[in-house]
Curated annotation (Swiss-Prot):
Organism classification: Eukaryota, Metazoa, Ecdysozoa, Arthropoda, Hexapoda
Active site: 63
Signal peptide region: none
Organism: Drosophila mauritiana
One cellular-component annotation, GO: cytosol
GO terms classed as biological process: cell differentiation; sex differentiation
A GO molecular function held by the record: protein histidine phosphatase activity
Any one Pfam family match given in the protein's UniProt record, by short name: Ocnus
Disulphide connectivity of cysteines: none
PANTHER family referenced in this protein's UniProt entry, alphabetically: BCDNA.GH02250-RELATED, JANUS-A/JANUS-B
Annotated family: Belongs to the janus family.
Name under which the protein is recorded: Sex-regulated protein janus-A
Described function: JanA and janB regulate somatic sex differentiation.
Length: 135
C-alpha cells in the first residue's frame, strides 16, 4: 500500500469510530426529579452525521455549566458539540410528568417541540407539556 491508501484507510477507520461513538450517545440524560435548567446539544461526529440530545442537571447553576460538562464528555469520544438553546424542565416522576419551558440567557431558547419529541423517546408513558412562558 502506498501512503495515500494508508491515509485513506486510516481516515475511514477514524470516521467509523466516530460514527460508533455518536450512535452510543444517549438521547436524554436529565435529573431524576425537580426543576432544573436544560440544554439541547447537537453532537457531531467527524463527518456529516449529528444528532440532537437533551441534558439537564439540578446541580448546574447555569446552562453553560451543563453544556461545558457534556462537551468535555463528547470531546473524549472524538465528537464535537454545539448548543442551539436551552430552557427549564420540571420533572415529576410520581406523576409521570415533564414540563419544558423558558429559555437560556446565554444560548437562547431551544426548540421545545423538538425537546418534547426527544424526551418522549426515554419517557414514552409520561405526559410532556411545553410552554414558551416563564424563565
Amino acid at each position: 500500500m502506498n501512503r495515500l491508501q494508508l491515509l485513506s484507510k486510516g481516515l475511514r477507520l477514524i470516521h467509523k469510530m466516530s460514527e460508533e461513538a455518536l450512535a452510543g450517545v444517549p438521547l436524554v440524560h436529565i435529573s431524576p426529579e425537580g426543576i432544573f435548567k436544560y440544554v439541547m446539544i447537537n453532537v457531531i461526529d467527524g463527518g456529516d452525521a449529528s444528532k440532537a440530545v437533551i441534558r439537564g442537571f439540578a446541580d448546574c447553576t447555569w446552562h453553560a455549566d451543563i453544556f461545558e460538562r457534556e462537551e468535555d464528555v463528547f470531546k473524549k469520544l472524538g465528537l464535537r458539540a454545539e448548543c442551539p438553546g436551552g430552557g427549564r424542565i420540571e420533572h415529576n416522576p410520581d406523576k409521570k410528568y415533564l414540563k419544558v419551558y423558558g429559555y437560556s440567557q446565554g444560548f437562547g431558547k431551544a426548540d421545545h417541540a423538538q425537546t418534547k419529541r426527544i424526551l418522549a423517546t426515554k419517557y414514552p408513558d409520561y405526559t410532556i407539556e411545553i410552554s414558551d412562558e416563564g424563565y
